[in-house]
Amino acid sequence: MAQKERGEREERDNEFVDRLVHINRVAKVVKGGRRFGFAALVVVGDQKGRVGFGHGKAREVPEAVRKATESAKRGMIYVPLRSGRTLHHDLEGRHGAGRVLLRSASAGTGIIAGGPMRAIFEALGMQDVVAKSLGSSNPYNMVRATFDALKHQMHPRDIAAQRGIKYSTLQARRRHLVDVEG
């Protein structure tokens, strides 16, 4: 019975894509000198709209990455995607001195983002997005700012429900705006 459960757990792990974003060597100063350890930042996603990030620390790199991956799987969020490939609307996220701007993009644009943000979008399964990092370029701040923005992503049905209007009315207004701008 226990053997079968392990096999099932491994199958579930295979559905996730993990990306190592950053590794940092840290030192603890002790009487005899310095003790070195490693801190890892990992992004995990199922490429279907779920993504999470985690931070792990250990004396060896593989152990730090494993801890970060487990932490990322525990803290996953769901992000609704338009047509399974891009954002529904533009977003802004902040964390510390880090600020990111995320914009939805037309089909074929690709992922136009740097560093840690690209890893998040690839793990999320997003295909078209334009992202700009402003302020801090610290990977931890950029990842947390990107997640702050993604948490505020709303499906148009939810927006229509909040406004108390029909979804079809909201879609008609959107099409009208696209026709006027284009």
From Swiss-Prot:
**Entry's InterPro entries?**
Ribosomal_Su5_D2-typ_SF, Ribosomal_uS5, Ribosomal_uS5_bac-type, Ribosomal_uS5_C, Ribosomal_uS5_N, Ribosomal_uS5_N_CS, Ribsml_uS5_D2-typ_fold_subgr
Q: Name one Pfam family in it.
A: Ribosomal_S5
A single GO cellular-component term on record: small ribosomal subunit
> In this protein, which residues make up the domain named S5 DRBM?
16-79
Coiled coil region boundaries: none
For this chain, one GO molecular function annotation is: structural constituent of ribosome
Q: Which UniProt keywords apply?
A: Ribonucleoprotein, Ribosomal protein, RNA-binding, rRNA-binding
Report the protein's function. With S4 and S12 plays an important role in translational accuracy.
Q: Which PANTHER family match?
A: MITOCHONDRIAL RIBOSOMAL PROTEIN S5
Q: Which HAMAP family match?
A: Ribosomal_uS5_B (MF_01307_B)
Q: Which NCBIfam families match?
A: rpsE_bact
Cite the domain annotation text. The N-terminal domain interacts with the head of the 30S subunit; the C-terminal domain interacts with the body and contacts protein S4. The interaction surface between S4 and S5 is involved in control of translational fidelity.
Q: What is this protein called?
A: Small ribosomal subunit protein uS5
User: What high-level taxonomic lineage is stated for the organism?
Assistant: Bacteria, Pseudomonadati, Pseudomonadota, Alphaproteobacteria, Hyphomicrobiales
* Name of encoding gene: rpsE
